[in-house]
UniProtKB/Swiss-Prot annotation:
Pathway: Carbohydrate acid metabolism. GO terms for molecular function: glycerol dehydrogenase (NADP+) activity. Mediates the conversion of L-glyceraldehyde to glycerol in D-galacturonate catabolic process. Also able to reduce D-glyceraldehyde. It catalyses: glycerol + NADP(+) = L-glyceraldehyde + NADPH + H(+); glycerol + NADP(+) = D-glyceraldehyde + NADPH + H(+). This is D/L-glyceraldehyde reductase. The keyword Transferase does not apply.
Length: 331
């Protein structure tokens, strides 16, 4: 997979397949990470209001535009996301304006609905129930209403709009209601969660997939994918065959791009930022070994298990069966 490879969105804009993710990037690190990524050659940045670091990301972008020879704003594909407390239609454009102000930018390349879940409106990103154990949901606004507001955002402020963490049911509903197909669906995806029915649906509809948590995570007591024996064996095997060092991270990122998908690894160390951007080709044996990991699917990001709990069933996993609510698709 080529580090400079792009795919074309249904809006006609090109999105680089490898992006630089900023989730869980600590203040004091993320600005330097963004600068380093742009210096190395990344041209796709993935951000969100809820990450709490957009101001610093904006400073990293500004520094890169000033110091990386020839780099212009239009060379960088910048994604951000609408947070759950701003799902009321009248709150959508002000939330976009707030993100643009934090970043010091005039426009975004892509704006996503972060989750198909509305929280109680207001300044608090995580409004809590009285006892603090749950996030306060707003069941009086639907994802169809929010999506309609997204599609009506001025093109001068955002070039393409999309969604994140949407299932086939959610996508069907917003497309049917508005006739507008999201440009992107950003989802948890890795060899342990291949999610083939959703991938096939999005391919049929012309929706590009962006994978987050590409390396998995260790919330379930499982090792990170990059630390798993199976992925290490694939990397070792490819290293011998290709006569160069192939790392487990590069293996996962190459797998994530098969079929024209995009992926947004996060790192704040210079060596890893560069390593994640290197081109690696997988052979059929490597792909088969990685696909085997998905025979028993494992999802890591389940809001019902978060603290405070989101009392909502989004993905119909065993963990969510006790949830009191589902996504409000339409009212």
């Amino acid at each position: 997979m080529s580090s400079g490879r792009t795919v074309t969105l249904n809006t006609g804009y090109k999105i680089p397949q490898i992006g630089y993710g900023t989730w869980q990037a600590a203040p004091g690190e993320v600005g330097a990470g963004v600068f380093e990524a742009l210096k190395v050659g990344y041209r796709h940045l993935d951000l969100a209001k809820v990450y709490g670091n957009q101001k610093e990301v904006g400073e990293g972008i500004k520094k890169a535009l000033a110091e990386v020879p020839g780099l212009k704003r239009e060379d960088i594909f910048i994604t951000s996301k609408l947070w759950n407390n701003s799902h009321k239609p009248e709150d959508v454009e002000p939330a976009l304006d707030d993100t643009l102000a934090e970043l010091g930018l005039d426009y975004l390349d892509l704006y996503l609905i972060h989750w198909p879940v509305a929280f109680a409106p207001g300044a608090d990103l995580f409004p809590k129930s009285e006892d603090g154990s749950e996030v306060q949901l707003n069941q009086n606004v639907s994802i169809v209403q929010t999506w309609k507001a997204m599609t009506e955002l001025p093109k001068s402020k955002v070039r393409s709009v999309g969604v994140s963490n949407f299932t086939i049911e959610h996508l069907d509903a917003v497309i049917e209601a508005t006739g507008v197909v999201p440009a992107v669906n950003q989802i948890e995806r890795h060899p342990r969660l291949p999610n083939q029915p959703l991938i096939d649906y999005c391919a049929k509809k012309g929706i590009i997939i962006t994978a987050y948590s590409a390396f998995g995570n260790n919330t379930k007591g499982l090792p990170l994918l990059v630390s798993s024996d199976e992925v290490k064996a694939v990397a070792d095997n490819l290293s011998k065959k290709q006569g160069k060092t192939v790392t487990p991270a590069q293996v996962i990122l190459a797998w994530s791009q098969i079929g024209g998908h995009t992926v947004i690894p996060k790192s704040v160390t210079k060596a890893r930022i560069a390593e994640n951007f290197q081109e690696v080709e997988l052979d059929d044996e490597a792909i088969a070994a990685l696909n085997k990991l998905g025979e028993k699917p494992q999802r890591f990001n389940i809001p019902y298990t978060y603290k405070p709990r989101w009392n909502i069933n989004l993905f119909n996993t065993e963990e969510e069966k006790a949830a009191a609510h589902t996504a409000v698709i339409k009212l």
